[in-house]
């Protein structure tokens, strides 16, 4: 394949996928996790003109956004993963004090993906040995974030939005993992991408939403009024900045921040990144949700392997697609 043919523009026609060579990416840089929010220019303009939008920008500038807390067990586990002297016994000893985490890790170790020889393990040490320390960290991170997104708060509309975010974030993350798996199958060269990390970057992409919802709650408590339908577009517009703050303070690397912020890319790198996977996922889910208005505004660049993946997924039955996503969610307990 020549360099000129190395990238393709993906378009969708009904249920079929087609591609043409040598086109460019033309992104208006939406937040990738908000694929479910209908495009509405009127609401978007009112959102960025609102007092709440400017209040959020100011809170972010002075580092006053309320951040979700990260559990101590996960912080300790991250430190253990960074220590080259850490053993499986160290991780098992940390987890054994938390019966819920222990049960989830043993269940993951016995899932079809990680138990290919069909040997059931019943103790945490065997489970940690089978999965490996890094995968343990990834599974626990995924479960922690998913639990966090199912937190109940007093404001009914905000609570419903968090539930909605949890559902769609899981859909976005598991689809990222699935696309990553299939890229490894179709690519004719080794990829420096891991489905597990693709899943986590997807789950964490809208983590800043918690801080934004808190700002909205404070805004309403102070006697202000703002239509919640307008507030959703403020959340969409501000989520990249808020998520970047959270991920930076939690110590996540640039791959996570790139997926959360969807930065404008001017140089075309032939290497597929997690951001590429996220953009493919975003475009595919717009197709799945029949969000034609948003799809018309966005194009995504793919190499030939990416084109094959998108062709397979867009022609896959709903039953088979959901089955493959369910295998991923079951493995991670989300």
Outline where the language-model segments fall.
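Surface-exposed, interaction-prone regions with an acidic/low-complexity signature
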Residues: 172, 199, 215, 220-233, ...
